[in-house]
Amino acid sequence: MPLLFLWFFLTSTSLVSALQTLPCINTTYFIPNSTYDTNRRVILSLLPSNVTSHFGFFNGSIGQAPNRVYAVGMCLPGTEEESCIGCLLSASNTLLETCLTEENALIWIANRTICMIRYSDTSFVGSFELEPHREFLSIHGYKTNETEFNTVWSRLTQRMVQEASSSTDATWSGAKYYTADVAALPDSQTLYAMMQCTPDLSPAECNLCLTESVVNYQSCCLGRQGGSIVRLSCAFRAELYPFGGAFTVMTARPLSQPPPSLIKKDSGKFSTETIAAIVVPIIVVAIIFLVLLVLSRLFARRRKSYQEIDLDQSGITTLHFQQLDFKTIEVATENFAKTNKLGQGGFGEVYKGTLVNGTEVAVKRLSKTSEQGAQEFKNEVVLVAKLQHRNLVKLLGYCLEPEEKILVYEFVPNKSLDYFLFDPTKQGQLDWTKRYNIIGGITRGILYLHQDSRLTIIHRDLKASNILLDADMIPKIADFGMARISGIDQSVANTKRIAGTFGYMPPEYVIHGQFSMKSDVYSFGVLILEIICGKKNRSFYQADTKAENLVTYVWRLWTNGSPLELVDLTISENCQTEEVIRCIHIALLCVQEDPKDRPNLSTIMMMLTNSSLILSVPQPPGFFVPQNKERDSFLSSQFTMGCTSQTKNDVTITNLDPR
């Protein structure tokens, strides 16, 4: 059985103080500063960004049992990103300040916006419990005609229960099971009300949860200024004043037909009308489900190339994903015209295309080196298509012919990060704020690939040219999952086929073919340094830098106490020096020689978002090249390998045979 929690709706800072003991459940406890405590702090710090990038609702976990922490975050639909993040940060801080040793807690916060956070040592997503519930009522009473008020009340709440339990918008999971409404009362008063269920409920469960909450409200709070009923899976609140931003553009709608009574006639029993209100929607939903099931099977037979993929963490219920024929791809790319070529990487060439419906896409024509069978290729493509995150490029479809394997991605208009970062005429468009936000976005994307997605994906070729920028300069990681799609085994720690870019690859990968999530961490560290300095790796092979690579150059600046000499001159006068130095510090921790000394992505995220967190002292990094007499012997020992194809620095390596 899932552990039970108490919810609360808050309206002001004073209420937060008055009710601060309510979020914590005194069931099981952890030791302060323990592994569980660290995991709790990490996942709470990650919730704001993940909730906003997953359409208002996100669930995830971090750590290994018995220190694994499960958490859910939610904002109401229509909430602006900054407001959502601010609300979730406030909720997280309240939990951290209040629940000092409890392993289970849940909090609702309601002010101008409303959000919820819940964490536990036990998985709870999808559970449905009506009890316990909690009642909060306003201290002031109101004067009005009781009979007229009850009539308005019943009609309004019945309408809201029906609307909330049927509002299953598939494009935004946070828009499910939510409604806000107003009604005119006697004596020129107005009744404001709001209902919300968590998106993991069924429509029938949401209906039942809200119906019970309305009944509870009638028992506790009628005759008061207002109040709230909160329980495990839903919340209901009504007031005589607009307590949320949703009411600023809302006017009272007419309440026509009187609904069935929601009041229990006998203790412990529902009225006939209430039972009907619960059963009828269930029957209707069941009929609709059966009709849709029959239609979907008929449709699937007619178009086998069309697939619907269920997603449980992306915030999207279904993903429309197509298998396209080669002729369609040829038409879209004008027969792979050179004028449409966007670039070329280790896995193949990329072209811009336009589908017949006008959608612009990026078409990756894979090189014919994969020994993977058609079915295996198709299976891996479908799996990778399930990865949905704001900071990942969307895979929209694929083409599979006897001699062709093609991937179709969303088209990202601002090209790749290196297009701006390494061009002296364009790098000024990336001020420090944009670069810092890009670092944060890449961090969230890799964290999703490593930990929060259905699959554990090691990118293996993380570099500036694989970071695309959308119209708002939000970074989107490209080429993720290519190891799976191309048939490179990611289940083993060693490989004879190295896919990566020299300069971004860590020592253990280049020399011994060993890879892990810490390989991506090393690449990310190099990428952070490039973002700060605005130069490619190979720029540091020039004689005037007195360094053989970027990592060596930065390490010498760090040990000499002059890290800010690394900063791109175009942003050096307008950057936040403390943020820059902290990012350099984090990057040096990422490029440590021993993979065990490199932080994981959840820790990196915490380092970026929590400036008060003390960072460890970095040691000499991997591929640090000593000066003078030691250099030749060092290079000989580090880079001796046999390889069939190898290029210098930033050219992708796709087929190496390490010692």
UniProtKB/Swiss-Prot annotation:
UniProt keyword annotations, A-Z: ATP-binding, Glycoprotein, Kinase, Membrane, Nucleotide-binding, Receptor, Repeat, Serine/threonine-protein kinase, Signal, Transferase, Transmembrane, Transmembrane helix
GO MF annotations in UniProt: ATP binding; protein serine kinase activity; protein serine/threonine kinase activity
Binding site for ATP: 342-350, 364
Record family assignment: Belongs to the protein kinase superfamily. Ser/Thr protein kinase family. CRK subfamily.
Protein name (Swiss-Prot/TrEMBL): Putative cysteine-rich receptor-like protein kinase 12
Residues listed as glycosylation sites in the UniProt record: 26, 33, 50, 59, 111, 145
Domain Protein kinase: 336-613
Residue intervals passing through the bilayer: 275-295
Presence of keyword Repeat: yes
GO cellular component, one term: membrane
Cytoplasmic side: 296-659
Membrane topology category: Single-pass membrane protein
Record localization: Membrane
Catalytic reactions of this protein: L-seryl-[protein] + ATP = O-phospho-L-seryl-[protein] + ADP + H(+); L-threonyl-[protein] + ATP = O-phospho-L-threonyl-[protein] + ADP + H(+)
EC category: transferase
Active-site residue list: 461 (proton acceptor)
EC id: 2.7.11.-
Disulphides: none
Positions on the Extracellular side per record topology: 19-274
